[in-house]
Amino acid sequence: LDIARRIQEGLFPKTPPQTPGYDIAGWSKPADQTGGDYYDWIALPHGRVAVMLGDVTGHGIGPALLMAICRAYTRATFPTQTELQDAMRRLNALLSEDVGEGRFITFAVAVLDPASGEVE
């Protein structure tokens, strides 16, 4: 479990995004050695940044693995989509195939445009 915890900790972002006029940070401390907590930020075209926050139901290795899958799909999906709704639909479709019955992922995303101050 200690190895799984270190791997999971390595999946969280190491440095904050460069967002002039804004400070973005994150920190997570799971109740057990591993868990399903998720936060991330991804640089998008035109200086925008997507900030994500999620939680997989449960504690332990299973939710930690689903969190890692969620992170991988998110990082693969968001930079390729120009519209937030399209990215969320694609992410939902991918995750729906992998999340077993009785499990779910709560997920929220905000897209910040530091130049205009708009949040979507």
What is each residue range found by the language model?
Residues L1-E120:
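… and, occasionally, acidic/histidine-rich disordered N-termini of signaling adaptors
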